[in-house]
UniProtKB/Swiss-Prot annotation:
Belongs to the multisubunit FA complex composed of FANCA, FANCB, FANCC, FANCE, FANCF, FANCG, FANCL/PHF9 and FANCM. The complex is not found in FA patients. In complex with FANCF, FANCA and FANCL, but not with FANCC, nor FANCE, interacts with HES1; this interaction may be essential for the stability and nuclear localization of FA core complex proteins. The complex with FANCC and FANCG may also include EIF2AK2 and HSP70. When phosphorylated at Ser-7, forms a complex with BRCA2, FANCD2 and XRCC3. Highly expressed in testis and thymus. Found in lymphoblasts. This is Fanconi anemia group G protein. Changing residue 71 to P: In FANCG; associated with a mild clinical phenotype; disruption of HES1-binding; no effect on FANCA-binding. Changing residue 546 to R: No effect on HES1-, nor FANCA-binding. Its main location: nucleus. It is linked to Fanconi anemia complementation group G: A disorder affecting all bone marrow elements and resulting in anemia, leukopenia and thrombopenia. It is associated with cardiac, renal and limb malformations, dermal pigmentary changes, and a predisposition to the development of malignancies. At the cellular level it is associated with hypersensitivity to DNA-damaging agents, chromosomal instability (increased chromosome breakage) and defective DNA repair. DNA repair protein that may operate in a postreplication repair or a cell cycle checkpoint function. May be implicated in interstrand DNA cross-link repair and in the maintenance of normal chromosome stability. Candidate tumor suppressor gene. It comes from Homo sapiens. Changing residue 387 to A: No effect on BRCA2-, FANCA-, FANCF-, nor XRCC3-binding. The gene is FANCG.
């Protein structure tokens, strides 16, 4: 009777194994199929077959002779399911937990251990595995899948403890996860073992590459390029698919750039470009490298190529029905040097760099292309500036207007400003309520007054370029009126305002007022009305004491009006200011405002100040 039972059991085991092997072959056939729909259908059928087989095996009491096959089927099911879904879920963790419980059932160790977590279950199973050598290969495959799941979930502490237990290390002897992964030595697969989609050694190689890359990239992001190098070299030398190798080489290039090795950086970036069609990250890094080297032409060419590359649809290969390196990498991080953003974000970088480097004509064209790209897709939402990498839509409009004015296209700039006003002026009646919300700390400081005021400022400058002095003065006055009307009289400090944001906004407001007052003052000077100009320059000094240009224009006007004593006193004040530090310098200004301030910064300032110093009485000489 027992022989008959054994024969029946052996026959069932053979049938289950044949079914597993057939389903694995079916999945591999699907993997090599060029037809997407057929590929997906074959893989899905194989997955359902494995699910049914696993259900049959786990419907019986756990038995050591059957467990190697059961664990193999579990691993094949998890691998195929994760690859089809392109990610891990809680279901896979439950599948692993159920398998561990089944192993312990054979050792009569189930009991209260069911209440324990996965890590505790693994400790128990690995301690029991010395009594079950026939399960060793299957358990190592299951370890590989558990490691993949924990790595993708960033549970590195649990993963390190699992590998320590697996390697027989002393608890706490090594927390170097890379070293623990290298030390892990999966047993060789037996020739007559059930077929698997991926063996333990293959999983180890994937884990080693994925973790080395993750660790290197994290060190690079946190500002430790020297530490990142060794991990990235480890990733490059491992089982590294070409798309990942492009990223690894780009990260290595970024490390060497930050460490002051531009030639090595360039070699890695060239290697990255040769590895595949994912040209975005290496081209962006190349633009940073050329900017650091001061090669503006090469920098802008790299950015232009990047814009074109981002316009080409990505031709991603169909994923293998395996646990791949890409499956274990973290989602894109905005702080990562490999994040090149969208085509519009890159177009903005190109346009702004052209503006900053004096290529106004190119900047104007790039900004107009950018606005067409943004406005064509959908109605953009106007909101406060987000975190890097780019400004909000109104600031893009303002930067574009600056580029047009600088390129001598004042009429086009006026048209653009009118478009911006039509989109933002409707918000102005709500400003008093928005400022009140900001004062109470319930909402962020509103940026709309800055945008609308800056628009009138740029319109004024465009009219100056067109020779319409009266209209220009009117626009500068409108800018000032809005600034003084919109600014809250009392701003509570402390909890009501984010300090950094408040300081940046205050600096921008001060500099915007100074720019409008100086611009209007210069028009009064041009029309021979020095007294009115003096009033504006005096007010600009009061409004923005950290702006040296305000002192210079005031000093020039006082000298023209022959108010010698006041001019001398102001000169001494300016000298004292030169030796001090100013808070305004700590806060970056919007690009459109920086560009505008450079227009009203007199080129002969230093020569005039030196001439004025030499004209002072001897007792005033330094």
């Amino acid at each position: 009777m027992s022989r008959q039972t054994t024969s029946v059991g052996s026959s069932c085991l053979d049938l289950w194994r044949e079914k597993n092997d057939r389903l694995v072959r079916q999945a591999k056939v699907a993997q090599n199929s060029g037809l997407t729909l057929r590929r997906q259908q074959l893989a899905q059928d194989a997955l359902e077959g494995l699910r049914g087989l696993l259900h049959s095996l786990q419907g019986l009491p756990a038995a050591v002779p059957v467990l190697p096959l059961e664990l193999t089927v579990t691993c094949n099911f998890i691998i195929l399911r994760a690859s089809l879904a392109q990610g891990f879920t809680e279901d896979q963790a439950q599948d692993i937990q159920r398998s561990l419980e089944r192993v312990l059932e054979t050792q009569e160790q189930q009991g209260p251990r069911l209440e324990q977590g996965l890590r505790e279950l693994w400790d128990s199973v690995l301690r029991a595995s010395c009594l079950l050598p026939e399960l060793l290969s299957a358990l190592h495959r299951l370890v590989g899948l558990q490691a993949a799941l924990w790595l993708s979930a960033d549970r590195l502490g649990d993963l390190a403890l699992l590998l320590e237990t697996l390697n027989g290390s002393q608890s706490g002897a090594s927390k170097d996860l890379l070293l623990l992964l290298k030390t892990w030595s999966p047993p060789a697969e037996e020739l007559d073992a059930p077929l698997t989609l991926q063996d333990a050694q293959g999983l180890k190689d994937v884990l080693l590459t994925a973790f080395a890359y993750r660790q290197g990239l994290q060190e690079l992001i946190t500002g430790n390029p020297d530490k990142a190098l060794s991990s990235l070299h480890e990733a490059a030398s491992g089982l590294c698919p070409r798309p990942v190798l492009v990223q690894v080489y780009t990260a290595l290039g970024s490390c060497h750039r930050k460490m002051g090795n531009p030639q090595r950086a360039l070699l890695y970036l060239v290697a990255a470009l040769k590895e595949g069609s994912a040209w975005g990250p290496p081209l962006l890094e190349a633009s940073r490298l050329y900017q650091q080297l001061g090669d503006t032409t090469a920098e802008l060419e790299s950015l232009e190529l990047l814009v074109e590359a981002l316009n080409v649809p990505c031709s991603s290969k169909a994923p293998q029905f395996l646990i791949e390196v890409e499956l274990l990498l973290p989602p894109p991080d905005l702080a990562s040097p490999l994040h090149c953003g969208t085509q519009s974000q890159t177009k903005h970088i190109l346009a702004s760099r052209c503006l900053q480097t004096g290529r106004a004509g190119d900047a104007a064209e790039h900004y107009l292309d950018l606005l067409a790209l943004l406005l064509d897709s959908s109605e953009p939402r106007f909101s406060p500036p987000p975190s890097p990498p780019g400004p909000c839509m109104p600031e893009v409009f303002l930067e574009a207007a600056v580029a047009l004015i600088q390129a001598g296209r004042a009429q086009d700039a006026l048209t653009l400003c009118e478009e911006l006003l039509s989109r933002t002026s409707s918000l102005l009646p709500k400003m008093s309520r928005l400022w009140e919300d900001a004062r109470k700390g319930t909402k962020e400081l509103p940026y709309c007054p800055l945008w609308v005021s800056a628009t009138h400022l740029l319109q004024g400058q465009a009219w100056v370029q067109l020779g319409a002095q009266k209209v220009a003065i009117s626009e500068f006055s409108r800018c000032l009126e809005l600034l003084f009307r919109a600014t809250p009289e009392e701003k509570e400090q402390g909890a009501a305002f984010n300090c950094e944001q408040g300081c940046k906004s205050d600096a921008a407001l001060q500099q915007l007022r100074a720019a409008a007052l100086i611009s209007r003052g210069l028009e009064w000077v041009a029309s021979g009305q020095d007294t009115k100009a003096l009033q504006d320059f005096l007010l600009s000094v009061q409004m923005c004491p950290g702006n040296r240009d305000t002192y210079f224009h005031l000093l020039q006007t006082l000298k023209r009006l022959d108010r010698r004593d006041e001019a001398t006193a102001l000169w001494w004040r300016l000298e004292a200011q030169t030796k001090g530090s100013h808070e305004d310098a700590l806060w970056s200004l919007p690009l459109y405002l920086e560009s505008y301030l450079s227009w009203i910064r007199p080129s002969d300032r230093d020569a005039f100040l030196e001439e004025f110093r030499t004209s002072l009485p001897k007792s005033c000489d330094l």
